[in-house]
Amino acid sequence: MLNFYKGKRVFVTGHTGFKGSWLCKILANAGAQVTGYSLNPPTNPNLFEIANIEGDIKSVIGDIRDFDLLKKSFDEAQPEIVLHLAAQPIVRDSYKMPAYTYETNVMGTVNILECVRQSDCVKSFLNVTTDKVYENKEWQWGYRENEPLDGFDPYSNSKSCSELVTHSYKNSFFADGRVAISTARAGNVIGGGDFANDRIIPDCVRALEKGEDIIVRNPHSTRPYQHVLEPLFAYLMIAKAQYEDIKFADYYNVGPDECDCVTTGELVDLFVKYADGKINWINKSEKNDVHEANFLKLDCSKLKSVFGWTPHWHVTEAVEKTVEWSRCYMEKGDVRKCMDKQIEEFLASRI
C-alpha cells in the first residue's frame, strides 16, 4: 500500500499533533510530498519536535480557522490527497472552551472543504472524526455507521457536526464524483509520543517519569483502545482506495476487536505490567466531574467486509509498544529509529 504514496502530494491538517506526527512520518518514509498545516505543537514536550518531523515535510504553522492562510498554503501545495486531522481534541477542554472547540472542529472542516471545493487538484479527501460522534446510549453493543450522530459534550458534538458538514459538502458539491470523500470514526488511540493532558496513557507516562502513583478518574469506563498505527494505516488505506475507485468513498468506523475493548482500569493494569510493576495506580473518581461516556464500543464490520481489514495488534501489544517508545524517550534514545522500528513491526504483523 505504501508504494502508492510515493511521489503523491498529500496535505495533512493537524500535522503537529500526536497522530499527525506519526502520520507524517509514515508518509515521509513512503516518499510522499507532504505539506502539513497546523498550529504550533500543542504540548511541551511534543512528538513533532522530538522526532524532527519538520525535517521530513513542508510544515506551515497556521490556524485552521484562518481561511486565507489555509487557502494560500493549500494552493501552493496543490494536493492530490487531503487528510483532515486538525481539531481541538480534548473532551474536558471542550467544556472550558466550547466556542473555540466548535470554531475549530466545525468551521475548520468547512474551511478545508472550501479549499477542496475551489481546487481542481484533489482526488481524495478524508475527514478524521471520532467514535464519540454517535448518540451514546450506554449500551454494550458497538455503534454502527448508520447510528444517529449526536455527541453529548462540546467536543463530541462538534465532531458530529463536522460529520454532517462533510456529508452536506459531499452531496451538494461533489455529487459528480470529481472528489472522493470519506470520514473515519476512530476509537481511542494510544502510543509513544502522546503528551496531552487529561489522557490516561500520557498520565501514566508522566507518573512513571516522576515515580508517582497514576491517578485514574474513571477506571470502569470502557473504551475501544488501539495503537495509533491502527487507524493511521486505515486512513491511508481508505484514502488510497477511494483515490483509485470512488465506490469506496463512504463513512467508516475504525477500532479494535471486541476482545480489546477494555476498561480504563484494565488498560492501566497493562501499563503497570509492562513498566515492570514499578508504579501503582489509585482511583480518584470525581462525583461532580464533567460528563463523559461510561461505555463506548465501535462495530467495525463494514471496514472489515469492504477492505478485508483486521487489526494488527491486540491492546496488550499496543500498551507494550507504548511503554517501549516511552522508555526510549526517557532514556534519551533515538525515538525516530524507534518509530521506524515500530512501523516496520506493525506492517509485518497481523492478528
Language model regions located:
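Residues in well-ordered alpha-helical elements
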Residues: 67-68, 80, 92, 99, ...
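C-terminal substrate-binding subdomain of Rossmann-fold SDR/epimerase-dehydratase oxidoreductases
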Residues: 28-30, 62, 208-351
